[in-house]
From Swiss-Prot:
This is 35 kDa gas vesicle protein. Belongs to the gas vesicle GvpC family. It is found in: Gas vesicle shell. May confer stability to the gas vesicle shells. Gas vesicles are small, hollow, gas filled protein structures that are found in several microbial planktonic microorganisms. They allow the positioning of the organism at the favorable depth for growth. One of its GO terms (cellular component) is gas vesicle. Keywords: Gas vesicle. It comes from the Bacteria.
């Protein structure tokens, strides 16, 4: 029984270590994915900020160049303004498209990571359910084996106790018969001692109460040995005194 419990405890600790290791792997994977997403987001943000900075610089340079150019060439101001407006519109359109593409890619990456985390959580839940099922099965088997072992031990102990009691009772009966045949002067004292021993033995072996033992003692001369109290006294009076 101790070995089964130790084996069960070792299996439980092994499962616990496996679950802990699996949780650690999941946390490391989740942390790695989050770090990767954070790095990508920071890189995209830095690129966007750099692009915006370059755009502002370009816009400032363009504005300065345009102002100088317009100052130098007043005759072609409208044409240059239209051209610059087209370039700015195209640049803004490209920037918006790039930003939308980056945002869409980031959303797709976030969805993919969320699906991976959900799959890992489902797998961990299934493993925990399987572990609990195996644990309940192991506990049930251990209880059944322990109960069967206890029943076998109790049956064997009962058989040994019955055999010992029968043997001891036979020896007591034989000794009482021998004492009855010899009719010695001290037979009465020996018989009383044997009666008391038999009563104590009955209490110890069969678990009788003190009142039951007294009933057995009161009924012993006539019921067990077939003698009445007067026969008992007559035998004692007719028995020579032997030291």
């Amino acid at each position: 029984m101790v070995s089964l419990r130790e084996q069960w405890n070792e299996q439980a600790r092994e499962r616990q270590r496996e679950i802990s290791a699996r949780k650690t792997e999941i946390e490391e994977a989740r942390s790695s994915i989050q770090k990767e997403l954070q790095a990508q987001y920071e890189a995209r943000l830095a690129a966007t900020q750099q692009l915006q900075s370059e755009l502002r610089q370009f816009y400032n340079n363009l504005a300065n160049d345009t102002a100088g150019f317009l100052e130098r060439t007043r005759t072609t101001r409208e044409q240059m303004a239209q051209k610059l407006e087209q370039e700015l519109t195209q640049l803004i359109t490209d920037l918006e498209n790039n930003t939308a593409a980056l945002l869409q890619e980031a959303n797709q990456e976030r969805v993919r990571v969320s699906q991976q985390q959900k799959a890992l959580a489902i797998e961990l839940k299934n493993q925990l359910a399987q572990f609990h099922e195996q644990l309940e099965t192991s506990v049930g088997n251990w209880r059944q084996e322990t109960q069967e072992q206890q029943q076998q031990t109790a049956a064997q102990l009962r058989e040994d106790l019955n055999a010992f009691s029968a043997n001891l009772m036979a020896q007591v009966e034989k000794l009482l018969i021998n004492l009855e045949e010899t009719r010695t002067a001290n037979a009465q004292q020996q018989r009383e001692a044997l009666f008391n021993f038999r009563r104590q033995l009955t209490v110890d072996v069969w678990g009788e109460t003190e009142s039951d033992s007294l009933k057995v003692e009161e009924n012993t001369p006539s019921d067990v040995w077939g003698e009445t109290e007067s026969d008992f006294l007559e035998v004692e009076e007719n028995t020579p005194f032997v030291t």
